[in-house]
Design a protein with these regions (language model features):
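N-terminal pre-catalytic "stem/leader" segment of glycosyltransferase-like enzymes
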Residues: 1-79, 85-88, 334, 359, ...
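Extended catalytic core of nucleotide-activated donor transferases of GT-like folds
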Residues: 48-138
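Conserved donor-binding/catalytic core segment of Leloir-type glycosyltransferases
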Residues: 170-224, 230-235, 318-339, 345-348
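Nucleotide-activated donor-binding/catalytic signature segment of Leloir-type glycosyltransferases, i.e.
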Residues: 370-403
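Short alpha-helical donor nucleotide-sugar binding micro-motif in glycosyltransferases
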Residues: 403-409
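Aromatic "clamp/platform" in nucleotide-sugar-dependent glycosyltransferases that forms part
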Residues: 417
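A charged, aromatic-enriched C-terminal amphipathic alpha-helix characteristic of glycosyltransferases
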Residues: 475-486, 493-528
Length: 549
């Protein structure tokens, strides 16, 4: 038990995701609110008694029980206003993460449950995670509407990570572990030729086609010739892939991988140098002659074979991988259209195309691998060959495993179109990691040139996420791909050639988070907003972690 210097107040907390469901809730819209509640809880425990309820239906019975005991209560709903009850007896305050420049309003009565202005007016006040959200609320509710801007107080929580994993521009080697699966670009044998798996019917038709092809009616311009430099680069790439196939253990036989890489090298680098007659002979050696078809007597329509489905990796194993060099990390839900993850990957692969010691680690907060696996493999295949490395981690990370990820990072990367706060960005900055990120929406509160490399962006119209009318009534931001690519290049150059500047930026990132989201200033602002004053006879409250749930 600890002594609280403030008047007694009971805080009733609720989030749709809790400790029991968090590992199964990756990718849900309410996923981030769980971490906001978890970060707020120690501050609230320092101001009064905390009660975490499993459902909103438990709020009023608990409120009446505490009221009979002569104690004040306040319900903090870690959810958007339209998912917060409006018929409770207990006073309610919404804790809101919102990334657009205006809040949903409903001119039609049938959409009233999505009208935030009515709900917030009923509550009378609100807590937001950023100045951007507070401005959006005041544009609708008026400048005098009580809104507290309160970022999550998480800086102190990363003291152990800062001590155990000091910032380093070039990682000498770190082991990452996850219970799920790891997709490594260097173990995939990537090639654009392997994007489409032929069906049995397509294979039969291809085998029966004659070798001689009739000349088209109009001349087709020949493809541009490959330069010697390009041929050498392709040769180097497949030599490296062949060496990896023999040196590392793999689910495929080594001979199969060697033949696969040899075939791809032949197609991309030397096939056009061989005479046509020789190419035909090689094709016949590789493709057996088709057997004669039996006479058909049936006139039934042939069945169309379906394309084979993608074989997904096993997601139940505990796997490890080692990363080294300049390591970029990003954490996001690939199903969230705001995250702009395609640009995050393409800009990296183009910026580091010839760089072998640059690695991009993507931690996916999504339970269903099938929702993005094909898109990811297609994108990486289209970008190949590239010398850099992309590692995708799918699954749930425990705290110790996440600490390894924090420690492995040289930079954290964000390329979002809009953010309500971006907890992962703040967490990596609290670990003393410089960043690559835009400075729009919530990130404008804590991102500038002293803590990272700014990605330029411009505004574009968009819709509110739950708008049933699908009208363009708000704005988000469009990150500039060229600016993101240049940020990768500039950050890599700093890490390799200017470690002093890197350490200065890392120190600035850590200091920014200490000023922005450390415990004491957040506690003071929260006490002032709720008009709590130091108590003459302070009461006992539960220690962090022992509050009733």
């Amino acid at each position: 038990m600890v002594v609280s210097p403030w008047d007694a107040m009971n805080f009733i907390l609720y989030s749709d995701v809790n400790d029991r469901s968090i590992s199964q809730s990756l990718g849900r819209p309410e996923y981030s609110y769980y971490f906001v509640l978890k970060a707020y809880r120690p501050v609230l425990e320092s101001l009064g008694q905390v009660h975490v309820v499993a459902s909103a239906a438990e709020v009023d019975p608990l409120y009446r029980q505490l009221q009979l005991a002569g104690q004040d209560s306040l319900f903090l709903s870690f959810a958007p206003p339209h998912k917060t009850p409006t018929d409770l007896q207990c006073p309610v305050v919404c804790v809101i993460a919102w990334e657009y420049d205006s809040i949903p309003v409903a001119p039609r009565e049938e959409d009233a449950h999505h009208d935030w202005s009515r709900i917030l007016a009923r509550h009378g006040r609100a807590i937001t995670l950023s100045s951007h959200t507070a401005q959006a609320i005041r544009r609708t509710m008026g400048e005098d509407f009580p809104v507290l801007v309160l970022p999550t107080p998480l800086w102190e929580g990363f003291a152990a990570v800062r001590q155990q994993y000091p910032a380093a521009p070039v990682n000498p080697g770190a082991v990452l572990q996850i219970n799920g699966c790891i997709i490594d670009s260097r173990a995939l044998g990537l090639s654009a030729d392997g994007l489409i798996a032929p069906t049995p019917n397509e294979q039969a038709v291809e085998a029966c086609e004659p070798v001689d092809i009739a000349a088209p009616s109009e001349p087709v311009p020949p493809p541009p010739e490959l330069t010697l430099r390009r041929r050498a680069f392709i040769t180097k790439h497949y030599l490296r892939e062949g060496w990896r196939a023999t040196a590392a253990s793999n689910e495929h036989p080594r001979l199969f991988l060697l033949k696969h890489n040899l075939l791809l090298w032949y197609r991309e680098a030397v096939r056009d140098l061989l005479p046509v007659a020789l190419r035909r002979q090689l094709f016949r050696l590789r493709t057996p002659a088709p057997e004669p078809l039996p006479p058909t007597v049936s006139v039934e329509a042939p069945t169309v074979a379906e394309h084979p489905q993608a074989c997904l990796p096993d997601t139940s194993a505990t796997l490890q991988t080692e990363v080294s060099g300049v390591v970029y990390v990003s954490v996001f839900n690939p199903e969230d259209g705001r995250k702009n993850w395609h640009h995050l990957i393409t800009a990296f692969c183009w910026a580091m195309r010839d760089v072998e010691d640059a690695t991009l680690v993507l931690k996916m907060t999504q339970n269903d691998l099938a929702t993005y696996y094909v898109h990811l493999i297609t994108l990486l295949s289209q970008l190949s060959p590239f010398a850099c490395r992309v590692v995708v981690m799918h699954g749930y990370l425990e705290d110790e495993e996440f600490a390894r990820l924090y420690g492995a990072a040289s930079f954290y990367v964000n390329a979002s179109r809009c953010e309500g706060l971006c907890l992962p960005l703040m967490e990596f900055m609290s670990c003393g990691r410089p960043v690559i990120a835009p400075d729009h929406t919530a990130m404008h509160d804590y991102i500038d040139e002293r803590v990272g490399f700014i990605v330029k962006s411009s505004r574009e119209p968009t819709i509110w996420p739950d708008d049933v009318r699908i009208l363009y009534r708000t704005l988000r931001h469009r990150p500039d791909w060229g600016s993101l690519k240049k940020a990768y290049e500039d950050s890599y150059a700093m890490a390799k050639s200017d470690p002093v500047a890197y350490q200065a930026m890392a120190l600035a990132a850590n200091e920014r988070m200490r000023e922005y989201c450390s415990f004491a200033p957040v506690q003071q602002r929260l006490a002032q907003f709720f008009q709590l004053t130091p108590s003459a006879s302070p009461e006992l409250i539960a220690e962090a972690g022992t509050a009733s749930c």
